[in-house]
Amino acid sequence: MDFDPTLPQVVANPYPVFAARRAVEPVGWSDALGEWVTFGHAEADAVLRHRGLGRLWRLRWPDEPLPNYTLLHEHSLLENEPPTHTRLRRLVAAGFGRRQVERLRGRVTEIARGLAWDVRDAAAGGSTVDLMPLYAEPLPVAVIATLLGVPDEDRGLLRPWSNAIVKLYEPAPPVDRRRAAETAATEYVGYVRGLIDYRRRHPGEDLLSDLIATRDADGSRLSEDELVATAVLLQMAGHEASVNVVGNGTYALLSHPAERARLTADLVPGAVEELIRYDSPLQLFERTATEPVRIGSVTVEPGQKIAALLGAANRDPAVFADPDRLDLARWPNPHLGFGAGIHFCLGAPLARVELQASLATLLTDLPGLALAGEPTRHPTFTHRGFATLPVTVDRAELNRS
């Protein structure tokens, strides 16, 4: 049976499909995608690390120019290989390392606790509230906006642009989505250029000001287009992947009351890794072969694409005992939720801090949080997350806390 990630049952719950395909073949051809796909952990890891498989940007619709959408990808460190990738990553990492992110931990916790109290107020009297717009979405959006120095009054502009752009990462997006993505990219690029111009004249204590000022060893800096693409990439990761990390992780925790009951502050760091493994916010990451590459039992020929299915890798029983069980104390936990190799997620430290702060806040400020009916998922495969997440808050639990 062909692997088709657009099927509603696959979007709703891909993990049984992954398991069935993995039992037959760890790597297979997908007619629906027109590329190879991996179902095993070892094979996905090999795809992500092999230097004969690269991120080679090419617009999928050559007869339909999307100039600003293309600009954001042609100049992105995510879509380039060495030596361009090496230079971009070195410059960006200088202002976005673990040490800089750790300095944000207190602010992230402050934002999370403020949002938790908004949830408490909205749920007063036993009301059902949607946790996505009240908590899971604004937390990462506020954090990345703070990091990049985006004014508070502009934050509402950014997520709709990001959301329109990432819809083109799904298989076979229709024409109207492509046009919407280009419109969003045009507005996004224009906004970020204006913000860069302002920060050139008025540097602040933010990452964008740091990126503008950062020089490489040879004195080179990020170009204007590279600055735009980098700022948008970081914002989009904060708006999409990080939102889904918080939403998916919270749902998984609330769906497993026994695991939630055992969650204590000392378990939070490991619990974060398990929640990312259990329901990966990014399910698919592509590479293109630049030479014949052997992955498992197949040879990926030059020009062919192969997709590492990260969610499938993270449920591989050859690596994870009882992989369909949520185990907050699981260790070791070599999940591929942040990728691997030279394109390992640059924002992983920030995503971890966000989810750690989120879980700690659930423990301290929302002990009575509970699911209130079935949530709804976005109808997308590549970016896996919730559109709604209805919850209630038990006032008696709050009073006891």
Predicted segments, located by residue:
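Cytochrome P450
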Residues: 1-401
